[in-house]
Amino acid sequence: MSVMDLANTCSSFQSDLDFCSDCGSVLPLPGAQDTVTCIRCGFNINVRDFEGKVVKTSVVFHQLGTAMPMSVEEGPECQGPVVDRRCPRCGHEGMAYHTRQMRSADEGQTVFYTCTNCKFQEKEDS
């Protein structure tokens, strides 16, 4: 037995056949070759060691919950401080606002205004 064969048959630790017993990486599935070789470290395992091993997978889909419709009064678009700004749609004086950092950090924030009367929304880059 050569030194290379000895290195490939001695493992660093004991593990399940799904993992390389030398480096711990996930092993590829056995193919037509006589050995399964770890892609990361090159450790070899005889393909006969996998005889009788059953691989079972399952996919579980969880049902999505139904979203509760938001009432106009509860919506996030109505939250925030109110400023003296005239709504371009209904002419009402007073719009709620909130800010978000939509662009890169060295750019200004984006201010979102919402009319407290008709819920019209507009944005302004500052």
From Swiss-Prot:
PROSITE patterns named among the record's database cross-references: RNA_POL_M_15KD, ZF_TFIIS_1, ZF_TFIIS_2
Keywords from the UniProt entry: DNA-directed RNA polymerase, Metal-binding, Nucleus, Transcription, Zinc, Zinc-finger
Record-linked SMART domains: ZnF_C2C2
GO MF annotation terms: DNA-directed RNA polymerase activity; nucleic acid binding; zinc ion binding
Family according to the record: Belongs to the archaeal RpoM/eukaryotic RPA12/RPB9/RPC11 RNA polymerase family.
UniProt: Zn(2+) 1 binding residues: 20, 23, 38, 41
Name of the protein described by the UniProt record: DNA-directed RNA polymerase I subunit RPA12
Subunit structure of this chain's protein: Component of the RNA polymerase I (Pol I) complex consisting of 13 subunits: a ten-subunit catalytic core composed of POLR1A/RPA1, POLR1B/RPA2, POLR1C/RPAC1, POLR1D/RPAC2, POLR1H/RPA12, POLR2E/RPABC1, POLR2F/RPABC2, POLR2H/RPABC3, POLR2K/RPABC4 and POLR2L/RPABC5; a mobile stalk subunit POLR1F/RPA43 protruding from the core and additional subunits homologous to general transcription factors POLR1E/RPA49 and POLR1G/RPA34. Part of Pol I pre-initiation complex (PIC), in which Pol I core assembles with RRN3 and promoter-bound UTBF and SL1/TIF-IB complex.
Span of the annotated motif Hairpin: 106-107
Domain notes: The TFIIS-type zinc-binding beta-ribbon domain contains an acidic hairpin motif (residues Asp-106, Glu-107) that likely coordinates the nucleophilic water and magnesium to cleave the scissile phosphodiester bond and release the mis-incorporated 5'-ribonucleotides.
Subcellular compartments: Nucleus, Nucleolus
Gene: POLR1H
Source organism phylogeny: Eukaryota, Metazoa, Chordata, Craniata, Vertebrata
Family annotation (Pfam families): Zn_ribbon_TFIIS
GO terms classed as biological process: nucleobase-containing compound metabolic process; termination of RNA polymerase I transcription
Span of zinc fingers (C4-type): 20-41
